[in-house]
Amino acid sequence: MKNEAPSLPDLLASLARQTRQPDEIVVVDGGSQDGTVALLECWRDRLPLRIIVMPGATIAEGRNRAIAEARGEIVAVTDGGVVLEPDWLERLVAPFEGDEAPDVVSGFFVADPRSPVELALAVTTLPDAGEIDPARFLPSSRSVAFRRSLFLAGLRYPEWLDYCEDVVFDLRLQRAGARFRFEPRAIVRYRPRPTLTAFALQYFRYARGDGKAGLFAARHAVRFATYCVFLPLVVWLRRWWLFLLAGLGAAAYLRRPYRRLWRRRADFPLGWTARAAVLIPLVRLIGDGAKLAGYPVGLLWRARRYGLRRTWRSIPERLPPPPGV
């Protein structure tokens, strides 16, 4: 974590409330300047904290160091800026103690929006648990546990990648034959980005990470074809059936966010729900625009350093972090 002082007390308090207490908590700080480390020190008498300061460390470097320092066989991973449900650790660890124990347990995460903008971001970008296909789900490292023996066997978070590092780690675990189990009740809560500008930057970085790692190329190709080929043709040719096709496509693209918003309508004021409904199409456009901008930057980064034929499958996991783009 880095500069998480505002949200850190809630995270630490949620750790203290766990129905199954952790044997140890290894925290790596990436060089915070806002008092994060001092706050951690204040909690040493309430939690079994081990604090490691690594100024300038990337997310992947910090996680790898924390796992290397851990002593237990099962490692549960979360992030700064979240709040854990009281039974999060208990539910995340329980499958390892049963029959046919897995190697990885995928927890879940839900949004905790504090404004109509955050609500719109939540329903547009985050799936509900019922939408997840456990066989294909790639867990976020906000909520995941795995056997440390996988790490000791050489599987690492990719230190050459600044964003999407948990996706690459998941894919490499799958490729190594790790057995996954989905536990949707192991929940962490977190706030979406507070502004559309912050959201755009987040999605630019995610798409740049996809380009760097060679992730989801088909999805990005469809997005480029839609915005850079199909929609310009619709405007240029002005055929009614093309406008109809574009409208049907937009309706299908927006259907799922509106369904999520409808399911959550009782949880928020009516005014919030109405404003979020208006914002959903804008969120889609901003997110797609950010991805259209970020993905080529990532491709260029990979082409210059490794060549476009190399992807997360062949780029070594342990490399000094390259300069940012």
Where do the model's predicted regions map?
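A recurrent flexible, glycine/aromatic-enriched loop bordering the glycosyltransferase active site
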Residues: A111-P113, P127-F146, L161-D162, V168, ...
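Short aromatic/hydrophobic "clamp" motif used to bind/position activated sugar donors
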Residues: V75
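A conserved acidic beta->alpha catalytic loop
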Residues: D29-A38, V82
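Catalytic donor/gating beta->alpha subdomain of glycosyltransferases that bind UDP-sugars
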Residues: P158-A217
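Conserved donor NDP-sugar-binding/catalytic core segment of glycosyltransferases
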Residues: D87-E118
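Short, acidic, metal-binding catalytic loop of nucleotide-sugar glycosyltransferases
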Residues: A13-P22
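Membrane-embedded multi-pass helical conduit in multi-pass membrane proteins
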Residues: C228-R302
